Design a protein with these regions (language model features):
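Short S/T/G/P-rich N-terminal loop/turn motif that feeds into the first structured element of a domain
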Residues: 1-63, 75-76, 83-179, 210, ...
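A short beta-turn/loop motif at secondary-structure boundaries
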Residues: 69-75, 193-199
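Conserved RNP beta-strands of RNA recognition motif
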Residues: 80, 205-207
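Short gly/pro-enriched beta-turn/loop segments at secondary-structure junctions
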Residues: 141-147, 187, 198-200
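A short glycine-rich, hydrophobically flanked beta-strand micro-motif that places a catalytic Asp/Glu
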Residues: 186-196, 204, 236
């Protein structure tokens, strides 16, 4: 007869770890730090936008924090990137804003909707900069006129690798981004979207730069890495746009 849960030997009982939802980093001296703050970012795309100027005026009047892009692949397409430290913003102020005024007349493109949160991987020395200040500064930087946004889902094979193997793969991937960033050609925004994406993706990536060509090269280079070539299940769809409006940096 199968034993009831309360009849199992004590040594077989599962040890439940304490829930911890904070982001963690590490000081230069090796001390662990934590911060329970993060930015949520959402991209919503629309068609049927004949007059971008009216959209800009409505965004400024409402005090929306974010970016309006013109879709390079759709002459009547736009996308609105909004950011907030609380997801309530997207279903309260933003929801009401999009249901009225010029945005209410547009045609939503739900297949291009992306929602994610900033995160730390454990070695960052300045968590506030990593999670809040740097991502906000990047998307609102007037010099970074072009953007490519896309979701991705890792294959299960990546999760079966050891931590050492995972780190080596991520360093290869991250090295490309750092080299382009040092040259001022492109910067990335990486957001976790576990459980936040209707297609069950894992991450949302934004590539931002003063010109579009280097951003395309970043994607091309990353195709050759072990993570993309061996351990990705899905990549895209891609939104490609140029900044039409940005809110003032905080």
């Amino acid at each position: 007869m199968k034993a009831r849960v309360d009849d199992r030997p004590e040594e077989e009982e599962e040890v439940v770890a304490e829930a911890d939802v904070a982001e963690h980093g590490r000081t230069a001296d090796g001390e662990t730090t934590s911060l329970d703050r993060r930015f949520f970012m959402q991209l919503q795309a629309f068609g049927g936008a004949g007059d971008t100027e009216q959209l800009v005026l409505s965004l400024e009047a409402a005090g929306v924090e974010g970016v309006l892009y013109e879709d390079v692949n759709d002459p009547r397409g736009v996308a609105l990137l909004t950011l907030s430290e609380t997801p309530d913003t997207f279903v309260s102020q933003l929801r009401g804003f999009l249901q009225s005024g010029p945005f209410a007349e547009l045609e939503p493109k739900p297949d291009l909707t992306m929602l994610g949160r900033t995160y730390a991987i454990g070695h960052e020395q300045d968590l506030e900069d990593t999670l809040v200040e740097r991502p906000r500064g990047r998307v609102l930087d007037p010099e970074l006129r072009w953007a490519i946004w896309y979701p991705l889902r890792r294959a299960g094979s990546f999760e079966q690798l050891s931590r050492k193997e995972q780190n080596a793969i991520l360093m290869e991937h991250g090295g490309i981004g750092m080299s382009f960033g040092r040259a001022g050609l492109g910067y990335d925004i990486r957001l976790a979207c576990h459980g936040l994406d209707k297609a069950d993706n894992d991450f949302v990536v934004g590539l931002l730069g003063p010109e579009l060509h280097p951003l395309s090269i970043i994607v091309q280079r990353m195709r050759k890495t072990r993570q993309t070539s061996l351990h990705l299940e899905r990549l895209g769809p891609f939104f490609v746009g140029r900044v039409a409006w940005q809110s003032a940096p905080a």
